[in-house]
């Protein structure tokens, strides 16, 4: 997996298909993720794959929880979060039932050697669980890496004890703080890319914290920041600070998100386009009218640059959506790209996983088809998205 990432452009970003969690009928799979350190990252992977994330449990949604959560396993209604990681790693949609959490799964595993002894088989697994150290699962590893990324204030934090004691108190895993520290230092440090997690100091705010730690190690290594943060709200405030402090970094991430969405196998792919948020007040020209556009007009439109007030307004809207849905910048910009920069459609998509008009979201393959000079392909797109949405997509791509 690491070798495949070396061939890509960004090992820290999602690389799986944008339709991984889209059903054959074009509808998006809906997921509910229980609060955990990995929730934000899982949400990013799900949304990048075309799925949707519910803020509360909804009918028809796939309920996700980390293995070892007593309430989730007792109900039998939850699917392991490992399902998302495995789907992303293999880049294919796997069978849900194979990842269902429940007391029966542990009992079946422990009683395979003695299928006939019900009374003895039911009693034996419990002593075996506590006879030695509890094995680390992939979900545990993700929780550790995510917790370090979101709570470590300096490189020296991971070698101290305060960080790990705080993680043990949070009850995110069943392991002691000594085991958590040992697991990270000996097996996980530097392996973030294998779990599709970036290194901690990747954002401007993280860089600022790192510089502050070098200037004042004692203040950076204090336990106070850990006490002020909660696992249910990972880095929300830090994302806001990052955008406010460095708008250039935001613009760069917008371009990166665009490139990620627009990347195709052919060499004739068009130049990167910026996100233009529109309220859809005016109806765009139809595909037929658009085809009559003069070349000179197209060149003039391409040469137009976005003004600073427009950039500021776009950043403000994106920040509001990030705060409203508790998502990262890349996920929100991807949603805008998939909805042709339409604010209303993007908001509806982030809230419910569907556009308000009932049409599907745009994928990279749809954009490739849109570039083809083929009447049948264009008619198929009009049938799929509606003539007005196709016209809006054409206008959006020009910008």
From Swiss-Prot:
GO terms for molecular function: G-rich strand telomeric DNA binding; phosphatase binding; telomeric DNA binding. One of its GO terms (cellular component) is nuclear telomere cap complex. Residues 112-125 have a biased composition (Low complexity). Residues 280-304 have a biased composition (Acidic residues). It is found in: Nucleus; Cytoplasm; Chromosome; Chromosome, Telomere. One of its GO terms (biological process) is telomere capping. It comes from the Eukaryota. A motif (Nuclear localization signal) lies at residues 383-399. Ubiquitous. Highly expressed. The modification N-acetylalanine is found at residue 2. InterPro entries: BRCT_dom, BRCT_dom_sf, Homeodomain-like_sf, Rap1_C, Rap1_C_sf, TE2IP/Rap1, TERF2IP_Myb. There is a cross-link at residues 114, 194, 208, 212, 240, 372 (Glycyl lysine isopeptide (Lys-Gly) (interchain with G-Cter in SUMO2)). The modification Phosphoserine is found at residues 36, 43, 154, 156, 203, 206. Keywords: Acetylation, Activator, Chromosome, Cytoplasm, Isopeptide bond, Nucleus, Phosphoprotein, Telomere, Transcription, Transcription regulation, Ubl conjugation. The keyword Nucleus applies. Residues 78-101 form the BRCT domain. Residues 104-132, 196-244, 264-311 are annotated as: Disordered. Residues 128-188 form the Myb-like domain. Associates with the I-kappa-B-kinase (IKK) core complex, composed of CHUK, IKBKB and IKBKG. Homodimer. Component of the shelterin complex (telosome) composed of TERF1, TERF2, TINF2, TERF2IP ACD and POT1. Interacts with TERF2; the interaction is direct. Does not interact with TERF1. Interacts with SLX4/BTBD12. Acts both as a regulator of telomere function and as a transcription regulator. Involved in the regulation of telomere length and protection as a component of the shelterin complex (telosome). In contrast to other components of the shelterin complex, it is dispensible for telomere capping and does not participate in the protection of telomeres against non-homologous end-joining (NHEJ)-mediated repair. Instead, it is required to negatively regulate telomere recombination and is essential for repressing homology-directed repair (HDR), which can affect telomere length. Belongs to the RAP1 family. Shares a bidirectional promoter with KARS1. This is Telomeric repeat-binding factor 2-interacting protein 1. The lineage of its organism: Eukaryota, Metazoa, Chordata, Craniata, Vertebrata. The gene is TERF2IP.
């Amino acid at each position: 997996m690491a070798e495949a990432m070396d061939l890509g452009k960004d090992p820290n970003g999602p690389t799986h298909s944008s339709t991984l969690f889209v059903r054959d009928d074009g509808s998006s799979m809906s997921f509910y993720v229980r609060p955990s350190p990995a929730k934000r990252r899982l949400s990013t992977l799900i949304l990048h794959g075309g799925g949707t994330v519910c803020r509360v449990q909804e009918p028809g949604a796939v309920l996700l929880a980390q293995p070892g959560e007593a309430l989730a396993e007792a109900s039998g209604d939850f699917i392991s979060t490992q399902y998302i990681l495995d789907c992303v790693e293999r880049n294919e949609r796997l069978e849900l039932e194979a990842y269902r959490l429940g007391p029966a799964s542990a009992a079946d595993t422990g009683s395979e050697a003695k299928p006939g002894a019900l009374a003895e088989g039911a009693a034996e697994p419990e002593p075996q669980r506590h006879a030695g150290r509890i094995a680390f699962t992939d979900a545990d590893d993700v929780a550790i890496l995510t917790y370090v990324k979101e709570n470590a204030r300096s490189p020296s934090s991971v070698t101290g004890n305060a960080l790990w004691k705080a993680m043990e108190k949070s009850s995110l895993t069943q392991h002691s703080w000594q085991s958590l520290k040992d697991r990270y230092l000996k097996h996980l440090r530097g392996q973030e890319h294998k779990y599709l997690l970036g290194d901690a100091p990747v954002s401007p705010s993280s860089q600022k914290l790192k510089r502050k730690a070098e200037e004042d190690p004692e203040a950076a290594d204090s336990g106070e920041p850990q006490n002020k943060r909660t696992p249910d709200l990972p880095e929300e405030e830090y994302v806001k600070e990052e955008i406010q402090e460095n708008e250039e970094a935001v613009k760069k991430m917008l371009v990166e998100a665009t490139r990620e969405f627009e990347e195709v196998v052919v060499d004739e792919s068009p130049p990167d386009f910026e996100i233009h948020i529109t309220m859809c007040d005016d109806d765009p020209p139809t595909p037929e009218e658009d085809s009559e556009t003069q070349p000179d007009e197209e060149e003039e439109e391409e040469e137009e640059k976005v003004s600073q007030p427009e950039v500021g307004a776009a950043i403000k809207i994106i920040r509001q959506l990030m705060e409203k849905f508790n998502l990262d910048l890349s996920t929100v910009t991807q949603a805008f790209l998939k909805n042709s920069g339409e604010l209303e459609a993007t908001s509806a998509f982030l809230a419910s996983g569907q556009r308000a008009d009932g049409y599907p979201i745009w994928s990279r393959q749809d954009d490739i088809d849109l570039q083809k000079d083929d009447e049948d392909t264009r008619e198929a797109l009009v049938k799929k998205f509606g003539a007005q949405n196709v016209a809006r997509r054409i206008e959006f791509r020009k910008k």
